[in-house]
């Protein structure tokens, strides 16, 4: 399966290392880079994480914008300028940069949340708060997922 699914909470050690869930690493197995690309979410106080192929899709979408527009500059700065490549070590861990940990409020634990083509890394209590609001929105908007056929 090529989709990031489920939620996991893993510890972050004193060297800022955290183990990426094995099934997430399996999804990334087809990527050319043995690791992930991480950048601060522009929607939430979390870290968005993906493979090189998704970054390429984002690049293509951003390049459709006017090259001198504020929007394009903002997206390029926030996604590409703030992105970091995180290599897996022999145990499937990555080292989270302090800037990303600070953005997400992560200290001793990290909550991995599958979002299909990406996954997010949250401070666990912050994710629980977000989950409550997401459940309400999903319930209110559930009819938008009807089959259009």
From Swiss-Prot:
Query: From which domain of life does this come?
Result: Bacteria
InterPro entries, alphabetized: MraZ, MraZ_C, MraZ_dom, MraZ_N, MraZ_sf, SpoVT-AbrB_dom, SpoVT-AbrB_sf
Domain SpoVT-AbrB intervals: 7-54, 83-126
> What does the UniProt keyword field contain?
Cytoplasm, DNA-binding, Repeat, Transcription, Transcription regulation
Localization per record? Cytoplasm, Nucleoid
Query: Keyword DNA-binding on this protein?
Result: yes
The GO terms describing molecular function are: DNA-binding transcription factor activity; transcription cis-regulatory region binding
What do the Gene Ontology cellular component annotations say?
cytoplasm; nucleoid
Give the record's GO biological process terms: negative regulation of DNA-templated transcription initiation
Looking up Pfam families in the UniProt record yields:
MraZ
Family (UniProt): Belongs to the MraZ family.
Binding partners and assembly: Forms oligomers.
Name of the protein in its database record: Transcriptional regulator MraZ
Species of origin: Rickettsia felis (strain ATCC VR-1525 / URRWXCal2)
